[in-house]
C-alpha cells in the first residue's frame, strides 16, 4: 500500500502490488455495514422514504427481515416493497420519485456534486475500519477490493475521501447487475487476478473471500461458486453495527443464524477480524 501526503497533510492510501509472487488470497468487501455504519444514513433514508409516502416509519427489525429474504439489496426497490406490504399498492409512487426522495434524504444535495455541499444522512456515517486496515491487509499478502450495491458517488466518498484510498478496486451500483447476481464479484476478482499477474479463476488461482453483512451478500458468493466451482471461495459475514449493542444480543444471534443458513462459512465479530479468519482458512487449505 503506497502512502502519500496531499497538500493538506492528509495521508492517502493507494493499493498496489509489491509482491514478487501472486497474492496469497483475495479479500473482497461489501461497503455498507462492513466498511461503514449506514444505520443512520442509508437505512434511515429508506425508512424516511417509506414514511414520506405512507406516514409509517419502518423499524430496524422490519428492514432486517426484508433484507433477510435475500432479494432486496437495492434500497430503492426495498422502499417500494415496504410500501407494497403496507397495502399502498394502488398509490405507489413511481420508481423515479422514490429515487428522488431517497436521494434527497441520503445525500441532501447533488450526488454528483461537491460532497462538501451534501446535507443529508450520509454525514451520519461512521467508519468501521481505519485507513491503516488496508495497509495491514497488504502486509499480510492479501489483495482487496469492494463489491457494493451503493451508488458510485457514495462509494467513492467513503473510500477515497473518508478512508483516503486512491483509485480503490470497486464495483458499485450500475457497474454490474444487482447482487445476488455474481457478475460484479466475478468481474472484480478477474480484474484483481490479472492486475497481480495471478492465474485466472480456477483451481490454480489464489483463494477468494467475500465479506458482507446480508443474506444477499452470502448468496452472491454462493452463486459465484456455482459459476466457477473449481475456484476456492469463502463466504464470510458480519452482523450490521446496529445489532452489536448489548440490548440487541438476541436479535444478533437470530440474524447470524440466518446468515449461516444462507451459506456463510464463518461469522466474524468485526470487519477487522477478517485477517485472522483468512489466516485460519489458508491454514486449512495448507492441510489439504
Please place each PLM-identified region on the residue numbering.
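Acidic, Mg2+-coordinating phosphoryl-transfer loop and its flanking beta/alpha structural elements
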Residues: 210-266
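Active-site neighborhood of HAD-like aspartate-dependent phosphohydrolases
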Residues: 18-64
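Short acidic-hydrophobic, aromatic-tinged amphipathic segments that line or gate anion-handling sites
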Residues: 265-273
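Substrate-recognition "cap/lid" segment bordering the active-site pocket of phosphatases
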Residues: 145, 150-209, 215-229, 233
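Non-catalytic pre-domain segments flanking phosphatase-related domains
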Residues: 2-29, 81, 86-97, 279-288
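Short, surface-exposed acidic
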Residues: 54-67, 87-106, 165-168, 196-206
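Helix-loop "lid/cap" segments that line or gate small-molecule binding pockets
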Residues: 47-53, 76-91, 188
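Short, acidic loop-to-helix structural element flanking the phosphoryl-transfer center
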Residues: 107-146, 150-158, 182
